[in-house]
Amino acid sequence: MPSRREQILDTAARLFAERGFHGVSVVELGAACGISGPALYKHFESKDAMLAEMLVEISEELLRVGRERSTTAGSARAALEALVAWHVDFALAHKPLIVVQDRDWQSLPLEAREKVRETQRKYVDVWVKVLRSLHP
């Protein structure tokens, strides 16, 4: 069962995907979670902190599993197939997060934005390495 913190992040991702990060108030988010808006601050420092955690985590998970899939595959072709399957499965299973990452990442505080971009570059590098091994 997901922790309360995970439940809040899931609800926030859904609402941010529907209305945008700036289109959701803390009061609305709290109500959707079944708590008061101010009660959210027991779990997160701010709404920005929620966005940062969800987007840093999604980027880190993509990188971690992408590296794992590409390095445990038996060949470059198998690595590419594993990466494609992983990325598509992840995107389909986490549609709200993908929308938020695409649309709202610029709303992140600078430090989190840099962390997300750095992690995304590393994830792209995983793909580049596999593709270059197939087509040098």
Predicted regions and their residues:
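Short, structured motif recognition centered on aromatic/hydrophobic residues
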Residues: 13-16, 62-63, 80, 84, ...
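Amphipathic alpha-helical segments used for helix-helix packing
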Residues: 92-111
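Amphipathic alpha-helical packing segments from all-alpha helical-bundle domains
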Residues: 63, 110-135
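Helix-turn-helix
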Residues: 4-7, 11-49, 53
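Amphipathic alpha-helical interface segments
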Residues: 11-15, 86, 90, 94
